[in-house]
Amino acid sequence: MNNLLSKYKIGGVVLGLALSIGLTSCDDMFEPAIENHLGFEYMYDHPDYADGVLGNAYTRLPNGSYSFNDVATDDAVSNDATDAYRKMTGVDSWTSSNNPVETWRNCRAAIQYINLFLANVDKVNWNSDEAVRAMYEQRYIGEAKGLRAIFMYYLLRAHGGLDANGTLLGVPNTLEPSDVSSDFNSLEVRASFADCMKQLIADAEEAVRVLPVDYKDTDNETMTVSCLGKSYTVTKTTYNRVLGSNFAGRFSGRIARAVLAQATLMAASPAFASGSGVTYEQAAKYAKAVLDLNGGISGIDTNGLEWYADPNMKDLTAAQCPKEVLWRTEKSENNDLETKYYPPSIYGQGRINPTQNLVDAFPAANGYPITDAKSEYDPANPYANRDPRLAKYIIYNGQTAGSGNAVINTQADNATNLDGLNKDVSKSTRTGYYMKKLLRQDINLDPTVNGKAYHYTARIRYTELYLDYAEAANEAYGPKGGTGYSAYDVIKAIRERAGLGEFGEDPYLEECAKSKEKMRELIRNERRIELCFEGFRFWDLRRWKANLTEEAKGMSITNEEAGKKYTPISVETRNFKKDAFYGPVPYDQILNFPSLVQNAGW
């Protein structure tokens, strides 16, 4: 993606071009402010500048860092008192004017750039050769529509909701660029959620139709391509120039299929199902389409649990994704995550503290929930015989961490260092746990060493998509229904990868397979575990209309004469109001545009 990003750095001329539509009272919708003005005619004869207009939309995708909005759920808390997600859980702290998960401005601005690009793409002289020009134009149209679909998904997830009359609304569904002559009071009207989903699906399906599944070089000397309603025979050099591996990282047909799976699962979920026009059967169909490209069940990566710790990451080229990863950011060598989230004894700030709630979600090694007597869970030895993923994803008392395999003591009576419970309000754990997932354990943060390693952020992982399919298929067809493979088949494979069960069997899974309701509970729990700390649970709880106010808990461990004493503790309340299944429209937008309707309760 290096070549892609370099084109976006042409300068303010490119970014200003897209915004030369004129900004009046709508400046905040279409940032940044104009610094340079070039007429559209300049763009028509300079493809790099046209590319930069669409490039601005790319730069508005999540920037490669994790949000860790998990600290606003029952999965984690933060020891940083200034953390926006920590503060949003307070009484009346999440408001329409103070919204850490607001995406309105960024996504609406991205769509404005996209619409501007689409309105002019056919006027750009991409190349003097007719075939090359048609190939470029079709690819760019597919990219733009795919990007518009993903930004619509982000908008609906964060701002779709019920109005005071109980009508499920989406966002303004604008398909044309706005300019100084636009009537914003008529444009700034929220379309129905269903209409927004129809447009999202249409855009993403168009991207699937016209884009290559992946950008890969071909070895065929000639190829026939169909572009803009005509067929062309092109050489290998021409094909690779327009659709080859140099463009890996840009929106592709595979990514479009994944967005369809993500968005339709959201729309079919309890919070949106009544007004989205989308069914679980549709969501299952879209998820299966992308999983089939990955080989179905056999495509589940056996090393997918710790994709972030791949020692060969440094050798990844820009055109490569590991087996677990469908779409990723560029890799970079740093220690940013480790500096923030390692325990303090190994020079970290310990910012994310997993909760006892999340720890309890990990089953026993035999696959049974620890609340089930068949798990043989021992409260006096709570970390023994547990799901192997617990030790991979969470640092609990006595575990090792870091390049030196330091033993981490999280006990409340730890007198040795700051790793103990509440030893230092700015660095120590508040729950008795530290986050381990996403962190490289081969980094030494000692200031005399300042070690670094390669990282990237997975924008979309296959594990998410397998879980998407399992959830949708269970709701549509039951645990063992479906075409080709079932929800049961997916969950069986995921739990086998985790190392759950005994004697080659998973008796708890077999129990759940007899009931859609029990399988639903299991699928949701597997999703919670597999995707923890990646920003999913905040949105999952809302689309499921699940409990948002479960108290975050921790574990205090002390030494007693009879051995270690484990005492559950209350750490933090969750004070979300009843309307918090849906996020608000920004307050200033409601003030600026009387035609905009706010979601109920905000």
Give, region by region, the residue ranges found by the protein language model.
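C-terminal substrate/ligand-recognition segments
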Residues: 383, 388-494
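C-terminal motif of bacterial Sec signal peptides marking the signal peptidase cleavage site
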Residues: 22-25
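Conserved, well-structured interaction surfaces
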Residues: 46-52, 59, 84-161, 181-198, ...
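Long, intrinsically disordered, low-complexity segments
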Residues: 2, 107-110, 194, 199-201, ...
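An aromatic- and glycine-enriched ligand-binding surface/loop that stacks and positions planar moieties
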Residues: 27-88, 106, 141, 160-173, ...
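Bacterial N-terminal signal peptides that target proteins for export
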Residues: 2-13
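Surface-exposed intrinsically disordered loops and tails
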Residues: 215-245, 300-314, 416-418, 504-510
